[in-house]
From Swiss-Prot:
It is found in: Cell membrane. The gene is ctaC. Belongs to the cytochrome c oxidase subunit 2 family. The lineage of its organism: Bacteria, Bacillati, Bacillota, Bacilli, Bacillales. This is Cytochrome c oxidase subunit 2. Pfam families: COX2, COX2_TM, Cytochrom_C. Residues 21-47, 107-356 are extracellular. Its EC number is 7.1.1.9. Residues 67-87 are cytoplasmic.
Amino acid sequence: MVKHWRLILLLALVPLLLSGCGKPFLSTLKPAGEVADKQYDLTVLSTLIMVVVVAVVSVIFFYVIVRFRRSRVGENTIPKQVEGNKFLEITWTVIPILLLIILVIPVVLYTLELADTSPMDKKGRKAEDALVVNVRANLYWWEFEYPDYGIITSQELIVPTDQRVYFNLKASDVKHSFWIPSVGGKLDTNTDNENKFFLTFDSKRSKEAGDMFFGKCAELCGPSHALMDFKVKTMSAKEFQGWTKEMKNYKSTAESDLAKQGEELFKEKNCLSCHAVEPNDKRAEAARTAPNLATFGERTKVAGVKEANKENVKAWLKDPDSIKPGNKMTGTYPKLSDSETNALYEYLKGLKAESK
């Protein structure tokens, strides 16, 4: 019997240990913006209400068990019945209603406030007043378009802090779900309609997070659903304006001889039919079937999941399916030799927005 209790105790500790796993600032319990703060407050409020209810019911439950135990009242004693007691009937009807009212009022108020995306649809809207980002989810990558600036990026969302950023969400293939746990809870991306919402990124808490947050797909979409990650880089409004100017003036140029070989291979293998290498991609959405590779050389991840070192980039180029199963890149080009992947790596790592 003692062994069974030890096993039960051990199993009970497993969830506690697992709760400590995960990445920094990939948790709803570390809110870093206006939306996340409100959602966290509602979580705390609802949890407190439930804790109070469970505590009161548990106290009454154990009191009855102890007070009317057989050894104390005897075999044939029947406790006083309270059926039809008006005071008790009113009490256990009114209290739940009051608790629901306490919970419903902030939920409704916050829902209406967080659903207000009218500033993004105003005529004459300026990006400085209401920045809009079009998010397009694909199997298994993300595209971010800044329509006010004519900029398109992939896998890394760049946003200013301390202001509302408005999002148009849609999907190009199947249903996905856009989620940045630390900044605001998720919203689906659909193929047949657009969803809209806004998020804010608090500058102080962004600094604490190293100006970096992590986003995920929160809707099961295929074999690499768990690998459909993206990164969010935050910066001040002034720095953001500087970034947009850099991106507008961005030109992809290969410098070394090996990089130039990689550029020629990139064209020869017809990579440009799917990938763009500059952020001002004018093609229609239907033609943008693969991630935009502008600033690839500044990214810390390849395919959103592996460290962007030479070994991993070459492994991705040789066999994408070994890193992200089900991706659409696999089998679209002939097998590459080591010399070809070396040249392509050199070219791709040179794609940067930084001044050259």
